A protein has these predicted regions:
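Structured, active/binding-site neighborhoods that engage oxygen-rich ligands
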Residues: 1-341
Length: 341
């Protein structure tokens, strides 16, 4: 499997996970089961996750390894803000706060600190292109995504992006699922909220003792559905207990979204459909969890790993959130990243 194939699988998996999870955003697993039973079919288009990933890729194609926060801020000012003729539909809190800060004349890193949402998963959702750009080099992928993150996030929000970029970089080089999770942990502090959430999720799966990927996928017992049937069941409940901040009203919390996405990837043994359906079935920020799980598993399995029926539902970006990316298709973007690294 070559780099282009993995790049296409990564961004196609991201877009599919985003679109599949969009209707379930902010729902609980119980609500999802009551409405769909199991979410397996894409009903509509993607969200800001896909559009921001395309925008992040454009930054890499323009600046490569020399990317700086100043470059990212300049792109916001020249490509995003001038085209905002109304509300920034579907954008996350951190990105909305960043636009407001830039309009006030602030510069990074203050643009990511002045608002109250630096911990959001806005960077994690768009981190995959950095992993594509740095196959086999999680540390460099994490360094690059942080340059982007300093404009819109802070603290755990940046660490969540680093973890995803590192994981995708490892998957792009053919690392096995457990090694992908190890790569995510290797590029963030062990005592961070994000790292602790990932470790707790792995413990729930039994991955620390080496049982995840052997007994969790498709071998559910009564009352305990697993990744094989796409319904989290008791495993999902235990993952929620381990990492979800139940008392907080918003669901776009980077440490929990990243940990749940990695858990879905591990439970699905890197299979795109198993990982994504399990991830979106966890609810919460379901589109972002699905997008991250799809990016990791797509990088691991390549383009052929993305179900054909999903791939056929992914069209050019609508530009609903970011008009600058309207008409861009993730497969074209993936090809450009594969050539431009």
């Amino acid at each position: 499997m070559n780099h282009r194939d993995r790049a296409r699988g990564c961004l196609l998996g991201l877009a599919a996970g985003d679109a599949l999870g969009a209707p379930a955003e902010n729902m609980t697993p119980e609500q999802i089961i009551a409405r769909w039973g199991r979410l397996t079919e894409i009903e509509g288009g993607g969200t800001d996750d896909t559009e921001y990933a395309i925008f992040a890729a454009s930054l890499l194609l323009r600046h490569g390894h020399a990317l700086t926060p100043a470059d990212v801020a300049a792109a916001y000012r020249s490509e995003i803000i001038p085209l905002m003729t109304g509300p920034m539909r579907g954008a996350g809190f951190s990105e909305l706060g960043t636009v407001q800060a830039l309009r006030r004349g602030l510069e990074p890193p203050l643009t990511g600190r002045v608002h109250a949402h630096g911990w959001s998963d806005g960077l994690a959702m768009r981190a995959a292109p950095y992993g594509i750009f740095c196959p086999g080099d999680p540390a460099e992928a994490a360094r690059l995504v942080e340059q982007d993150g300093l404009v819109s996030g802070d603290g755990e929000g940046i660490l969540g992006g680093r973890a995803v970029a590192g994981a995708v970089a490892a998957a792009m080089a053919g690392a096995r699922p457990r090694e992908v999770a190890d790569a995510a942990l290797a590029v963030i502090p062990a005592d961070s909220w994000t790292a602790r959430a990932i470790v707790r999720a792995r413990e729930v799966l039994g991955d620390i003792s080496g049982t995840a990927g052997q007994s969790t996928a498709g071998q559910g017992t009564a009352g305990q559905s697993t990744a094989g049937d796409g319904i989290p069941g008791d495993l999902g409940r235990r993952l929620h207990e381990a990492v979800v901040v139940r008392h907080y009203p918003w669901t776009d919390v980077a440490p929990e979204a990243v940990a749940l996405a990695l858990a879905a990837f591990l439970a699905g043994e890197g299979d795109v459909e198993a990982s994504v359906t399990f991830g979106v079935g966890l609810g919460r920020d379901a589109d972002t969890i699905g997008a991250i799980a799809g990016a990791m598993s797509g990088a691991f399995q390549g383009e052929a790993g993305v179900p054909r029926r999903w791939a056929e539902r992914i069209g050019p970006a609508t530009g609903k959130c970011l008009p600058v990316v309207k008409g861009r298709h993730v497969l074209d973007v993936a090809d450009e990243l594969a050539k431009g690294r």
